[in-house]
Curated annotation (Swiss-Prot):
Location of the active site: C382 (nucleophile), H508, E510
Protein name (database record): CTP synthase
NCBIfam families associated with the record: PRK05380.1, PyrG
Protein species of origin: Staphylococcus aureus (strain JH9)
Regulation: Allosterically activated by GTP, when glutamine is the substrate; GTP has no effect on the reaction when ammonia is the substrate. The allosteric effector GTP functions by stabilizing the protein conformation that binds the tetrahedral intermediate(s) formed during glutamine hydrolysis. Inhibited by the product CTP, via allosteric rather than competitive inhibition.
Residues binding Mg(2+), per UniProt: D71, E141
InterPro entries xref list: Class_I_gatase-like (IPR029062), CTP_synthase (IPR004468), CTP_synthase_N (IPR017456), GATASE (IPR017926), GATase1_CTP_Synthase (IPR033828), P-loop_NTPase (IPR027417)
Keywords from the named record: ATP-binding, Glutamine amidotransferase, Ligase, Magnesium, Metal-binding, Nucleotide-binding, Pyrimidine biosynthesis
Length: 536
């Protein structure tokens, strides 16, 4: 039977529940268990797809096209699994589904209430996460902080699930903060005690407490928390601040967290703890030698979480070369043709990531022009690819006013236009081209060198696509279309072979990169940037 682990948080937000859940998932996977993980978000948006990046950070896309919380990126990268649409559940999605059922008459005229209708819907989605993946263990992170009014239906649902499935199949992990009071010169357990008291008042007794702390805990502190919170002493797990997130699984393993979970849930682990690969990765991360400077030109750079997966993918790509990646955050609204060199002259590579809307798009085009004309390694993603074709059309083909129909509906040369199937769609949420799609790579191209194969699959998130009316013109003037949909209809990758490294893709490769397995485009981009740096 599938076992369920729930990760809650108390005292303050941003304690690292997601990293704790991810690290535990990694430990259990390395013991030979089939693990999946999900996030419950208490906000009323159906999904984060239409939320501002300034509010929410990036939208992470799964293979099956779900637009999800950025924490799912952490989950996938840490555990090295591919998640699905059941891995992110919002209050908005739950309420929306319940209300649709009510309108259909599914409740036979009954009064629809938070208990049992909302809680039953939440529990149903809990079970689907396990059923859809045949998982041995489902780890669920509950967003927010214990006591938040928005989280109460989720807390009630996970309380009920223990009775539904049996105590032996359910486990609760609670993350808290152990603050250091400088004036007193000591760490205080009282916030943890009150947080657990709040959780117990809601009917949940934690089995494990993970304590976030700046300093090493004494055994007396652990004993005190165990006594006041009514758990075993070995079930108080210290999680110290670390220089690298990749240290956290090792910290938890050293305190036998995986053994405690396996014993408590009576899991059949196939192996003893195996973290050799993880230790090798951490050794590389802790011994980087030199840096490569990448100019990331975007419109949301004031909130770096808007590009979280891109940043992580760049870091992954630096590891094989033992290089740290120094990201130069460049606000595209400030870049022009005239001042581009001021921002980009000393970078080793230029990356233009995805985005939506007209604002700051001209600055991205100026950055792309600078990369093309000065032979600086360039990598464009999604909108970055679209604007690369726009820049080429304007400045090489001479099509003055060429643009994307999304950004300039009146453009005389719509190089980028709506996908045909998008023409009559009015709703914004969940209606883009989303998820994993195949791509055919053209022989003899940089793309083929990068991937080393003719067919690939990548994740997408876009509504607009390259306009095939301009295909022949671009190719006749030196831009190569190196990747298309298998039927040849949709342009997925472009490149300029006369440049040392100029490649762009319509898809989002950052969603498939792993710390121990960098995505091939990112790796090739960093390799080209390193060569450019060495030849300066």
């Amino acid at each position: 039977m599938t076992k369920f682990i729930f990760v809650t948080g108390g005292v303050v937000s941003s304690l690292g529940k997601g990293i704790t859940a991810s690290s535990l998932g990694r430990l259990l996977k390395d013991r030979g268990l089939n693990v999946t993980i999900q996030k419950f978000d208490p906000y009323l948006n159906v999904d984060p797809g239409t939320m501002s990046p300034y509010q929410h950070g990036e939208v992470f896309v799964t293979d099956d096209g779900a637009e999800t919380d950025l924490d799912l990126g952490h989950y996938e990268r840490f555990i090295d699994i591919n998640l699905n649409k059941f891995s992110n559940v919002t209050a908005g999605k739950v309420y929306s589904h319940v209300l649709k059922k009510e309108r259909r008459g599914d409740y036979l005229g009954g009064t629809v209430q938070v208990i049992p209708h909302i809680t039953n819907e939440i529990k149903e989605r809990l079970l689907l996460a396990g059923e859809s993946t045949n998982a041995d263990v489902v780890i669920t992170e509950i967003g927010g902080t214990t006591g938040d009014i928005e989280s109460l239906p989720f807390i009630e649902a996970i309380r009920q699930i223990r009775s539904d499935l049996g105590r032996e199949n359910v486990m609760y992990v609670h993350c808290t903060l152990l603050p250091y009071i400088k004036a007193a010169g000591e760490m205080k357990t009282k916030p943890t005690q009150h947080s657990v008291k709040e959780l117990r008042g809601l009917g949940i007794q934690p089995d494990l407490i993970v304590v976030r702390t700046e300093y090493e805990m004494t055994q007396d502190l652990k004993d005190k928390i165990a006594l006041f919170c009514d758990i075993n002493k070995e079930s108080v797990i210290e999680c110290r601040d670390a220089d690298s997130l990749y240290e956290i699984p090792l910290q938890l393993s050293q305190q036998n967290m995986d053994d405690i979970v396996i014993k408590r849930l009576q899991l059949n682990a196939k192996y003893e703890t195996q973290l050799d690969e993880w230790k090798q990765l951490l050794d590389i991360v802790n011994n980087l030698d030199g840096k490569i400077t990448i100019g990331l030109v975007g419109k949301y750079v004031s909130l770096q979480d808007a590009y979280l997966s891109v940043v992580e993918s760049l870091k992954h790509a630096g590891y094989p070369f033992a290089k740290d990646i120094d990201i130069r955050w460049i606000d595209s609204s400030e870049v022009t043709d005239e001042n581009a060199a001021e921002y980009l002259a000393d970078v080793d590579g230029i990356l233009v990531p995805g985005g939506f809307g007209f604002r700051a798009s001209e600055g991205k085009i100026s950055a792309i022009k600078y990369a093309r004309e000065n032979n600086v390694p360039f990598f464009g993603i999604c909108l970055g690819m679209q604007l690369a074709t726009v820049e080429f059309s304007r400045n090489v083909l001479g099509l003055e006013g060429a643009h994307s129909a999304e950004l300039d509906p009146a453009t005389p040369y719509p190089i980028i236009d709506l996908l045909p199937e998008q023409k009559d769609i009015e709703d914004l949420g969940g209606t883009l081209r989303l998820g994993l799609y195949p791509c055919s790579i053209k022989e003899g191209t940089l793309a083929q060198d990068v991937y080393g194969k003719a067919e690939i699959e990548e994740r997408h998130r876009h509504r607009y696509e390259f306009n095939n009316d301009y295909r022949e013109q671009l190719e006749a003037n030196g831009m190569v279309i190196s990747g298309t949909s298998p039927d040849g209809r949709l342009v997925e990758m472009v490149e300029i072979p006369t440049n040392d490294f100029f490649i762009a893709c319509q898809f989002h490769p950052e969603f498939l990169s792993r710390p121990n397995r960098p995505h091939p485009i990112f790796k090739s981009f960093i390799e080209a940037s390193l060569k450019y740096q060495q030849n300066k």
